[in-house]
Amino acid sequence: FLVRGFQGEELSRAAVIATHDDTAKLILLARLSLYGHRAARLHDEVLELVAEWGPADPARRLRVLNATKTDMALADLETSLRERLPAVEESIQRQLRAQLPADVALLKDRLEALASERAERAKAQLGKRAEDEANAFVKVLREQRERILKTRTKHDSEFEQLAFGFADHELRQLRDNRSYWDRRLARIERDLELEPAAIRRTFEVATAPRIEPAGAIVLWPQQMSP
């Protein structure tokens, strides 16, 4: 899917930008999305895979960069855009774009591996968030239950002693309070049983990761030809 997507109009419109660096670089951009139940979008991120090659290398051997060098390449891209370097010669741009389908085919497995790695990392983060929120919910309900139980116990211990001194409407209010606490406790028990699983389900990835090509950028050293 990734290769098919990048071999369409995205590659014919790929940006070719001049750079101060002495190596050529290909930056592939893809969007990774994870969806939960009822098509709820849980995660979005842009993937960047960067490969470099020596402009004078006739074999055009692509070397995929590690995370640190990828960040440096992206910083180099920002610098080139900010400084508005002169445009790369049009004939060079055409040659570089013509080579992109083969480049993308070579990088397909690495891009898919990167997408799989990032998807698993995102799932782990979502799972941790689900546990944190479920545990926080349980903690709040248990604290509420404890306060209600203490209040109800105090009410019950005093009720019989004070009952004869209360008017009928006051006794009704006391009984209404007791009934409310009982209903609230029953609701808390029900929520403790059901809601943690519902919270976890909210953060559960329900479909295969969706990966969409987002663009391709070539950084080309100034004053060089392919």
Please describe what each predicted stretch is.
Residues 2-226:
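Charged, non-catalytic accessory extensions
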